[in-house]
């Protein structure tokens, strides 16, 4: 079960995303997971490097010599938000997307369409600081994911899912409403469907 401390930290990161402009719960979880993966990738690399050093055996790391700057422990301390953002957009994110470029592995298939959506350097650095403060050991990782999924479930119940505009437009075009139709949207949130219908009728 998730501890109160971890829950509070996750809630704070969620709020940072929300106030920073990412309000779709699915996108919050997606971007949260990408950054968490980047952090854990560096932690695994550090552990394997240490073990190889103790055992005196060679280790060919995940991060080549010319990609060391893509490690969480390196870029989180750059200090300049714009520099971190540029490195993430043009270096770190493309790097993790292409870790398995064969196109056959499950990783390649799931990461092939991954998009970095954090809109500003300020938001990215706040989220990095928040995630860096998460001390995830053992079962706490599973607890974290369960909690994120529970937030996704409650967001759906609270009507926090927004239907993308192009989907709304397609559905309205398929229905082909006429002025004499009576229209009801019982799951109305921001009234996207009704507004689109109004524009269509005009």
Predicted segments, located by residue:
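Non-catalytic, mostly N-terminal accessory regions of nucleic-acid modification and defense proteins
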Residues: 1-179
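Short glycine/serine/threonine-biased micro-segments
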Residues: 157, 187-190
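Conserved class I S-adenosyl-L-methionine
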Residues: 180-187
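Glycine-rich SAM-binding Motif I of class I
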Residues: 191, 195
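Conserved small/polar residues in nucleotide/adenosyl-binding loops
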Residues: 199-202
